[in-house]
C-alpha cells in the first residue's frame, strides 16, 4: 500500500493566507505560509520546514522521502529533493488532513 493517496478535499492546496501550518495531531510547528507555493500536484506544496526537526524523514527512493511530524510521528506526505520552484529547493507535498492552519494575528498598537 502506498503511503501517498489522494481522496480529494485538499483544503489547503489553494490556501495562501499568512500564518503557520502545524501538525493536526499534536500542534507542532511544521511549515510557514512563506514557504508555500502553487504546484500542479493535488496536495499543498512547501519548500522548507519551520524547524530542522519539524519533520522526520524515511527514504523511499533516491530523492524522495516519506515525512512525518518530528514530534508525534503523524504521517504528513513526501519531500522531493531538488524539485521545488527554484534550483536547490525541495518540494514537500503534504496532506491537508495532516495539517492545521494558524492564521497570523496582526499586532494591534495600543
Curated annotation (Swiss-Prot):
Q: Where in the cell is it found?
A: Cytoplasm; Nucleus; Cytoplasm, Cytoskeleton
Give the CC-aspect GO terms: cytoplasm; cytoskeleton; nucleus
| GO MF terms, alphabetically ordered | actin binding; L-methionine-(R)-S-oxide reductase activity; metal ion binding; peptide-methionine (R)-S-oxide reductase activity
Q: Which leading EC class covers this enzyme?
A: oxidoreductase
Listed under catalytic activity are: L-methionyl-[protein] + [thioredoxin]-disulfide + H2O = L-methionyl-(R)-S-oxide-[protein] + [thioredoxin]-dithiol; [thioredoxin]-disulfide + L-methionine + H2O = L-methionine (R)-S-oxide + [thioredoxin]-dithiol
Please give the tissue specificity annotation from the record for this chain.
Answer: In the embryo, expressed in the polster, paraxial mesoderm, tectum, otic vesicle and liver.
Q: Which UniProt keywords apply?
A: Cytoplasm, Cytoskeleton, Immunity, Innate immunity, Metal-binding, Nucleus, Oxidoreductase, Selenocysteine, Zinc
Q: Which family does it belong to?
A: Belongs to the MsrB Met sulfoxide reductase family.
Role description: Methionine-sulfoxide reductase that specifically reduces methionine (R)-sulfoxide back to methionine. While in many cases, methionine oxidation is the result of random oxidation following oxidative stress, methionine oxidation is also a post-translational modification that takes place on specific residue. Acts as a regulator of actin assembly by reducing methionine (R)-sulfoxide mediated by MICALs (mical1, mical2 or mical3) on actin, thereby promoting filament repolymerization. Plays a role in innate immunity by reducing oxidized actin, leading to actin repolymerization in macrophages.
Q: Please report the name of this protein according to its UniProt entry.
A: Methionine-R-sulfoxide reductase B1-A
Q: What is the organism field in this record?
A: Danio rerio
Q: Which gene encodes it?
A: msrb1
Amino acid at each position: 500500500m502506498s503511503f501517498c493517496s489522494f481522496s480529494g478535499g485538499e483544503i489547503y492546496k489553494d490556501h495562501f493566507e499568512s500564518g503557520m501550518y502545524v501538525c493536526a495531531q499534536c500542534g507542532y510547528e511544521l511549515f510557514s505560509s512563506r514557504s508555500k507555493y502553487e504546484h500542479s500536484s493535488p496536495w499543498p506544496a512547501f519548500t522548507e520546514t519551520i524547524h530542522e526537526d519539524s519533520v522526520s524523514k524515511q527514504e523511499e527512493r533516491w530523492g524522495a522521502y516519506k515525512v512525518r511530524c518530528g514530534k508525534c510521528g503523524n504521517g504528513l506526505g513526501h519531500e522531493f529533493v531538488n524539485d521545488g520552484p527554484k534550483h536547490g529547493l525541495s518540494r514537500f507535498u503534504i496532506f491537508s488532513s495532516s495539517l492545521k492552519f494558524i492564521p497570523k494575528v496582526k499586532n494591534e498598537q495600543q
